[in-house]
């Protein structure tokens, strides 16, 4: 049985990823800040675990509660209070980076000892086309072309960190996924994709074997070249 941890798993992309991986036979621990929001994940058969990626103690306790870990899905993210340069300030950048980047690294570092014991350790970091310069500059790309400066910058860091972890941990399969413009709370449900479509890349990467890709960036149609 494959044991998986999904962060931000109480709703949206995280909840749908949880549903699909349970259907694929995984035992899924659904990380969320507030266990009171865990009913939907629990009904799917997931095991809710209190996990605030911004709090080291919470992360340590969550990871410490896992018997083993084969797959880590870093999905938790926030937009933050700023969208354009007009209202951009350091605090807005800090809020986005605290959860989307520092929180991801906090979880990864805590989870590495468990992942290293797995016979097929896999990590998927959920990125965004907003953090991928080539997509932002491509008029044919269907990503949301809003500004969201702090969020976009943080997701660029997620993609780069994914490559760095993959280079430094060649025994693991570590990749980033691009959900595309998906209808979630994060964009007030304005996205044109369903959460199922938005989790296609994440789920596919979560299911790869030891000979699968690493250090890559994938959308729902496959690999996106850097």
Question: What are the residue ranges of the model-derived segments?
Answer:
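C-terminal helical subdomain
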Residues: 156-159, 167, 171-172, 176-179, ...
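N-terminal Rossmann NAD(P)H-binding glycine-rich loop of SDR-like oxidoreductase domains
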Residues: 10, 14-19
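Conserved glycine-rich Rossmann-like NAD(P)H-binding loop of the short-chain dehydrogenase/reductase
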Residues: 24-39
């Amino acid at each position: 049985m494959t044991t998986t941890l999904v962060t931000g798993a109480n709703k949206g992309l995280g909840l749908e990823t949880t549903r699909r991986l349970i259907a694929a036979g995984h035992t899924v621990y659904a990380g969320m800040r507030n266990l009171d929001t865990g009913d939907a994940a629990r009904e799917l058969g997931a095991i809710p675990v209190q996990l605030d990626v911004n709090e080291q103690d919470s992360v340590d306790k969550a990871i410490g509660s896992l018997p083993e870990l084969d797959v880590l899905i870093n999905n938790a993210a926030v937009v933050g209070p700023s969208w354009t340069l007009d209202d951009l300030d350091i605090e807005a950048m800090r809020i986005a980076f605290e959860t989307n980047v520092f929180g991801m690294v906090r979880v990864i570092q805590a989870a590495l000892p468990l992942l290293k014991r797995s016979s097929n350790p896999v990590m998927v970091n959920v990125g965004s086309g907003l953090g991928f310069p080539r997509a932002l500059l491509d008029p044919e790309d269907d990503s949301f072309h809003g500004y969201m400066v702090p969020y976009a910058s943080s997701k660029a860091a997620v993609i780069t960190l994914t490559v760095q972890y993959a280079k430094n941990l060649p025994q693991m399969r570590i990749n980033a996924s691009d959900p595309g413009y998906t209808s979630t709370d994060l964009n007030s449900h304005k996205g044109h994709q369903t959460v199922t479509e938005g989790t296609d890349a994440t789920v596919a990467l979560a299911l790869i074997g030891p000979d699968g890709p690493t250090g890559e960036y994938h959308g729902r149609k496959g690999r996106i070249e850097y």
